[in-house]
Amino acid sequence: MSAIVDIIGREVIDSRGNPTVECDVLLESGVMGRAAVPSGASTGSREAIELRDGDKSRYFGKGVLKACEHINTEISEAIMGLDANEQAFLDRTLIDLDGTENKARLGANATLAVSMAVAKAAAEESGLPLYRYFGGSGAMQMPVPMMNVINGGAHANNNLDLQEFMIIPVGAPSFREAIRYGAEVFHTLKKIINDKGLPTSVGDEGGFAPSVENHEAAIKLILQAIEQAGYEPGTQIALGLDCAASEFYKDGKYHLAGEGMTLSSADFTNLLGTWCDKYPIISIEDGMAENDWDGWATLTNALGKKVQLVGDDLFVTNTKILREGIQKNIANSILIKINQIGTLTETFAAIEMAKRAGYTAVISHRSGETEDSTIADIAVGTNSLQIKTGSMSRSDRMAKYNQLLRIEEDLGDIASYPGRGAFYNLK
């Protein structure tokens, strides 16, 4: 009864108004799984390939009809009749069918949509919530959210070079309370920004995008909001940064245009270290460019015992690259983005490899999202302990937070919120 009997790929629209791929998988029992894939703005050069049509007469070339056609033809032919419960076999079939290192032929947006839809159909037929289908009886840890409240870089049109300034409710007693902490700080920050006569419009991920004096001014705004909301910085709510440093790395230097600085890897490490000494920053993502492995080594040696150093563009959810990073003692955490690799099986392998090495795994959205909330179930199902899924606005972000609230309710008394314990990679 778990046999796949129909597969439909279609073009839908993401949170930025761009096309993306959605897939329906129908099983013999009549059960259906549906999944839609996200899309990034700042992307690592080694990510799996997102197949776009390139037809400038439709959506300025961003259409995904080719990817949908792949689903409706050769992918459908390859997996029709297979057992939806055999996720690893199905994903291997997709990988082999594509035949490239980076899913350039079929498109990672096509393979991922199918992979996710199959899992959701199998979970539905099993009568299990998706997180339980992924993780079994051991899935009971809620993730600590990293909430992007000020946007810069590729996610905003302001003078901030760093891409994300996040609040992390490490002192909350539960996920539900962590959401309350975040929402109250978000609304307080909105009032502070408004009172300064600055715009309170939000960026792609729901955070504010004010033009302020410099990066430290943005950090101080957030600290002010935390305190005015009645919380203690560092103890109850810590800070995180996503530098997205590849975006401003040119000719071997880091060009912070908003600061009027051009820095070497060592100098940028020193700047980040100074901020970590002055402010309660416990996580820095992509603190060096993806190809600056010497810079990553410098950063890890300097800060790796006291700050979570997350590789996003660095590792692109790829076990081959992660393995090399672990061997070279680069970073101490990996960001997990399902569309960077293109199947659930490969995603779970990256999470498991990170955990075995003592690295943390942070489940993440993309800047272009949909109402699909699968990453919430992945976070709990894999006991990944941390999630990045935007600010406290935009329904495409709230879809994930609301799913996590439902999961915590479903778990009841066995639900656990790790707080600062989610950062087990810090000494």
From Swiss-Prot:
One of its GO terms (biological process) is glycolytic process. Mg(2+) binds at residues 242, 285, 312. GO terms for molecular function: magnesium ion binding; phosphopyruvate hydratase activity. It is found in: Cytoplasm; Secreted; Cell surface. SMART domains: Enolase_C, Enolase_N. (2R)-2-phosphoglycerate binds at residues 163, 337, 366-367, 388. Its cofactor is Mg(2+). The active site is at residues 205, 337. It holds the Pfam family Enolase_C. InterPro entries: Enolase, Enolase-like_C_sf, Enolase-like_N, Enolase_C, Enolase_CS, Enolase_N. Binds a second Mg(2+) ion via substrate during catalysis. Pathway: Carbohydrate degradation; glycolysis; pyruvate from D-glyceraldehyde 3-phosphate: step 4/5. GO terms for cellular component: cell surface; extracellular region; phosphopyruvate hydratase complex. Its EC number is 4.2.1.11. Keywords: Cytoplasm, Glycolysis, Lyase, Magnesium, Metal-binding, Secreted. Belongs to the enolase family. PANTHER family: ENOLASE. Catalyzes the reversible conversion of 2-phosphoglycerate (2-PG) into phosphoenolpyruvate (PEP). It is essential for the degradation of carbohydrates via glycolysis. This is Enolase. It comes from Janthinobacterium sp. (strain Marseille) (Minibacterium massiliensis). The lineage of its organism: Bacteria, Pseudomonadati, Pseudomonadota, Betaproteobacteria, Burkholderiales.
